[in-house]
Structures are given as structure tokens and as C-alpha cells.
């Protein structure tokens, strides 16, 4: 009887260990007054999609991390979005650079209006680098899901095409910047934006899954 009880306990421990998340995602909290907290349902939905379709093991709930925090190193992938001003202190610049050059990955999603604020701040992080547009044949567009034309357009604002830019440090893509796309909006709960279709939302989630798969395998 004692032996059976011991075996049962071991089995329960093994089963519970399978539910321990391997990874976590975080949204970046920054200073400057911009709405860093936007797209509230985006990451939880992306996490669920990746766990279901890529068989990843992300913690279901996303977390929040400040740019200058040591906690940033707990996440293989961090997400920054917003419409307005962004300011990185010198300590935050150093911390973010250390994170990115040490294996971390930053996805910046322009929620329309972020561009003029985020570019100068990222220039402080990598003064020696320029954002380069990733061509449609870049591997990030051809992971589990194929996007032969590159970054998909999710929301229309002013007729410009969607563009995916990258910062490449010593041959490794460390930051992916989605511009004129609103990818994160597409990850949000269906119905958040009345004009969105299920098709456009699925397209956004598939592109997000490609991004996560690329980050975890590059």
C-alpha cells in the first residue's frame, strides 16, 4: 500500500511538472507619457495561439517589465507598443542593450504615432546600427506560416504599406519593428475593432506565431 502511495505521488509530481511554463512574455513599461499599456488582450491571445499551434509552453498570462529592470532577463521576448512619447534613461539604455546583445529579443509595434518617438530612443541603445527593412524572403516571414509578400497589413491609416524593420547586431536580429501594420491590434479579442474580420485577425496571429518561432529557434 505504501509503495502504491509513493508511486501515485511520483506520478502526480511528474504530471504537474508538465504544466510548468517554459517561457514567459512581457510587455515593456516605459517612461515619457506614451500608452505603453495598450493592446491589453494582445499578448494573452498570441500566447494561446502559439501554445495551441506551435506547441510552445508559454505562461498564459503576460507580464509587465520596466526597461531598466533586472527582471527583463527573465523573458526571451518582450513587446513594446503605443502611440506616443517614449523616453529611455541612460540606465535603461544600458540595460536594454545588455539584454538584446545577450540573447533577448524586442518586438516594437507602432500603434500608429510611435515612429518619431521610438527611433531616437533605439538609436541611443544601438548608435552604431540603423533599422533596415527586412525583405519578403527573410526567414521571419517563412516559419510555420508563409507570407510571400512580407509583413501583412492589419489596420489601414493613411494608405502606406506595412513594413518590417530590424536591428541586426553581429549577424543576429535583436529587434523587429512593425510599422504601418498594427500587428498587436490584430492579436486582440475579436470585436475590439468593429471593422476587423476573422481573416485579418488570423493573419495577424499567424505572423505573430512566425515571430515567436523565429525568436525561439534563431
What is each PLM-predicted segment?
Residues 21-23, 73-77, 101-105, 129, ...:
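Loop/turn elements at helix/coil->beta-strand transitions in domains of secreted/extracellular proteins
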Residues 7-16:
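Bacterial N-terminal signal peptides
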Residues 24, 32-33, 39-42, 115-191, ...:
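An acidic, glycine-rich "communication" segment
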Residues 25, 77-116:
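Short alpha-beta junction capping motif
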Residues 18-77, 81-84, 182-183, 187-218:
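Aromatic-Pro/Gly-enriched surface loop or interdomain linker
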Residues 1-7:
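Positively charged n-region of N-terminal signal peptides that target proteins for export
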Residues 57-65, 108-111, 129-137:
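Surface-exposed patches in mature extracellular/periplasmic domains of secreted proteins
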Residues 60-67, 89-95, 159-163:
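Alpha-helical scaffolding within the catalytic cores
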